[in-house]
C-alpha cells in the first residue's frame, strides 16, 4: 500500500492506544442522578432483543428507522417518545446520553462515528464496522471524544466464557498455542430476485445511506442484506464475530496477525447471496518468533449444515502444551489433559464481578466513566479478522500483513478492500479520516 493510502488508514498511536485513553465523559443523566437517556438507531428484531436488557436501567427517548412500520412498532414496545428516519434528529437532542446502533452493517460505523462526534456514548452491534478502515475511524472517534463505545460481543459478559478464559490464562492447559472456532447452522435459501418497487412505508434512500446506491430488491433488504457485499459482512461477520472474539481472547492475542488465509465459496445454495456459504480461515501471530510464542487461530463456517462439532453449533477448541479445552456460549465446557483424560473443572477462586447483562455493563461504564467489557478497541481487533478473512475469500489469496503499519503488503487489490466504495454523489454520513 502506498504511503498516501496508508495515512488514510492510520492515526497517531496516542489517539488509538488504550494506555492513552481517559474515560472522563459521563452521562448527563448520571450526573443528575437519573437513568441514562438513549436512542435506538435501527428498530428491527435485534433492537427488540437488546431492549430487554436496557428497559429497566435506561430511558428510551427515540426510535429511529427508515422503515416507518418498524420504528412505530419499536416505539410501542419501548415507550420511546419520538420517532424518526433520520439519525441526525437523535444526535441533535441534547438530552440523549447514548445511542444503540442495531442497523445493517454498512451503517454501524458511520452512525457510531457521528454519535461519538456529537458527544454521545454508543452501544454498537457486531460487527462494529463494515470494513477495516471504518473500524479504525470508529476507534479514533471514541478516543478523540472520550466517549464510551461498547461492542455487541456479549460473551465478554458471559460467566461461563469469562471463567473459561481465566482458566486458560491461569494455565489449565499450559501455553495456549492453537485454537479452532466454528459457526455451523442451516440458514435459508434467499432465492433469486430482481429490483422492484420500494414499499411505501420505507425511506429507502436513507436505508442505503453511505453505501453505493443499489435499487430496492426484496432479497437484499431486511435481514438478507447480510449476504451482499455492499451492505453486509456475510456470516463470518454476522455470527462468526462472536466465536472469533472468544477465540482471540482465549488465545491471548491482540492486534493484527502477520498472515491471513481463507478459502470458501457457495457449495450449497443456488441463490443471490454474494458471500460464501462455506469458509475455512486461518490467522497467525508470530509473537517474538520463538517456539512457544507463535499463535494460530482457525475458524470454520458452514451455513447449510446441522452436523455440529461436539454436537454444538458454535464453539471453540483451545489446544495447549498440556491439554485441550472446548467451550461454547451454549453452556458447554470440557477440559482434557495431554493424554486425553478429562480434567475436573473447578471455577477460579477469584473471578470478576459481572453485571446482569452486556447492556447494563455499558450503562454502568458510561455512568462511572470506566471501560466496558467489550470496549471498541477490543471489538475492532476481533472485527479486523472478519474483514481480513472476507478479503482472502473474495480475492482467492492469502495476505501478508504489517501489524504495526496496519497494512496489507504487496497486494493492491486486497489493500483497496480495507475500505469500501461509497455513493458517487456523496452522503452526509460518509466517514472522513
Regions found by a protein language model. Name each.
Residues 163, 175, 180, 186-234, ...:
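Contiguous beta-strand/loop segments that form the cofactor/metal-binding neighborhood of enzyme cores
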Residues 82-86:
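Conserved SAM-binding strand-loop segment of SAM-dependent methyltransferases
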Residues 1-16:
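N-terminal secretory signal peptides and thylakoid transit peptides that target proteins
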Residues 99-100:
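N-terminal Rossmann-like NAD(P) cofactor-binding module of classical short-chain dehydrogenase/reductase
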Residues 13-78, 155-158, 247:
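N-terminal Rossmann-like dinucleotide-binding module
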Residues 104, 109-157, 171:
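Beta-strand-loop-alpha-helix segment that lines the small-molecule cofactor/substrate pocket
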Residues 34-36, 147, 177:
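Nucleotide donor/acceptor-binding cores
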Residues 14, 103-104:
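Short glycine-/small-residue-rich Rossmann-like dinucleotide-binding loops
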Amino acid at each position: 500500500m502506498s504511503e498516501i493510502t496508508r495515512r488514510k488508514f492510520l492515526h497517531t498511536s496516542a489517539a488509538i492506544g488504550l494506555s492513552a485513553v481517559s474515560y472522563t465523559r459521563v452521562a448527563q443523566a448520571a450526573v443528575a442522578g437519573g437513568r441514562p437517556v438513549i436512542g435506538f438507531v435501527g428498530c428491527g428484531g435485534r433492537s427488540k432483543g437488546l431492549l430487554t436488557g436496557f428497559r429497566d436501567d435506561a430511558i428510551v427517548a427515540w426510535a429511529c428507522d427508515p422503515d416507518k412500520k418498524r420504528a412505530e412498532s419499536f416505539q410501542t414496545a419501548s415507550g420511546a417518545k419520538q420517532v424518526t428516519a433520520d439519525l441526525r434528529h437523535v444526535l441533535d437532542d441534547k438530552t440523549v446520553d447514548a445511542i444503540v446502533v442495531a442497523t445493517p452493517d454498512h451503517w454501524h460505523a458511520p452512525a457510531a462515528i457521528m454519535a461519538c462526534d456529537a458527544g454521545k456514548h454508543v452501544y454498537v452491534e457486531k460487527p462494529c464496522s463494515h470494513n477495516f478502515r471504518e473500524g479504525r475511524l470508529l476507534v479514533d472517534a471514541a478516543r478523540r471524544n472520550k466517549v464510551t463505545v461498547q461492542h455487541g460481543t456479549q460473551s465478554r459478559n458471559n460467566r461461563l466464557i469469562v471463567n473459561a478464559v481465566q482458566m486458560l490464562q491461569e494455565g489449565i492447559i499450559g501455553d495456549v498455542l492453537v485454537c479452532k472456532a466454528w459457526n455451523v447452522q442451516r440458514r435459508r435459501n434467499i432465492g433469486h430476485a430482481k429490483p422492484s418497487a420500494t414499499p411505501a412505508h420505507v425511506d429507502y434512500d436513507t436505508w442505503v445511506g453511505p453505501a453505493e446506491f443499489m435499487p430496492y430488491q426484496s432479497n437484499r433488504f431486511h435481514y438478507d442484506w447480510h449476504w451482499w457485499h455492499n451492505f453486509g459482512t456475510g456470516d463470518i461477520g454476522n455470527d462468526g464475530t462472536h466465536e472469533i472474539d472468544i477465540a482471540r481472547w482465549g488465545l491471548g492475542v491482540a492486534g493484527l496477525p502477520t498472515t491471513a488465509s481463507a478459502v470458501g465459496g457457495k457449495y450449497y445454495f443456488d441463490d443471490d447471496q454474494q458471500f460464501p456459504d462455506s469458509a475455512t480461515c486461518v490467522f497467525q501471530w508470530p509473537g517474538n518468533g520463538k517456539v512457544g510464542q507463535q499463535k494460530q487461530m482457525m475458524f470454520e463456517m458452514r451455513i447449510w449444515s446441522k452436523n455440529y462439532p461436539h454436537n454444538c453449533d458454535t464453539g471453540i477448541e483451545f489446544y495447549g502444551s498440556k491439554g485441550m479445552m472446548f467451550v461454547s456460549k451454549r453452556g458447554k465446557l470440557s477440559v482434557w489433559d495431554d493424554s486425553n483424560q478429562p480434567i475436573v473443572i473447578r471455577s477460579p477462586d477469584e473471578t470478576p464481578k459481572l453485571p446482569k447483562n452486556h447492556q447494563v455493563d455499558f450503562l454502568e461504564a458510561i455512568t462511572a466513566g470506566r471501560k466496558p467489557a467489550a470496549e471498541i478497541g477490543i471489538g475492532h481487533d476481533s472485527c479486523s479478522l472478519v474483514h481480513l478473512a472476507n478479503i482472502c475469500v473474495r480475492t482467492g489469496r492469502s495476505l501478508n500483513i504489517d501489524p504495526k503499519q496496519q497494512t496489507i503488503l504487496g497486494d493492491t487489490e486486497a489493500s483497496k478492500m480495507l475500505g469500501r466504495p461509497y455513493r458517487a454523489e456523496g452522503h452526509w454520513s460518509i466517514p472522513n479520516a
